[in-house]
Amino acid sequence: EDNWNRAHTYADMFTRLINGWRAEWKQGDFPFYYCQIAPYDYGIITEKGKEVINSAYLREAQAKVEHRVANSGMAVLLDAGMEKGIHPAKKQVAGERLALLALTKTYGVEGVNGESPYYKSIEIKNDTVIVSFERANMWISGKNCFESKNFQVAGEDKVFYPAKAWIERSKMLVKSDKVPHPVAVRYCFENYV
């Protein structure tokens, strides 16, 4: 939690830490699994008068490490945080997700999936943003739209608005009536979601 306000250096530092341990311990590229920082309202611990840093940037940096470091994986904990408690009570969720990573990536157990979808690219068609993911072949298509404060889109003005989203195969489609020409989309871009 101490790095929540230094996301801009986190991916490089964490990558060096893992590679340093591997070099020091001379065990090769041993599996390295870690937990995403759980959502929390960092405004609670921010000094009065200071800007509240958005920990979504740290979660993004943590996700990048998984793609930089061979034989690593991140257990996503977006649904396991506590708004007013920096140490979430849902420890079993974290343990189970780490175990799934080990089962699939280290031991090659088939029929279980420990990896979460990872952003690949976006395509914009008219008023809709189509988001493609890696590791998303397990999704079920659904035509039902759902609105959520967790999905937001912005136009050229970079003002984000809540959006509707739906799934088609391994893609997430996102749009907002307030943004006729979207250029960006974001998901769970708050400290606590």
Segments from the language model and where they lie:
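Cell-envelope and extracellular/periplasmic
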Residues: 1-193
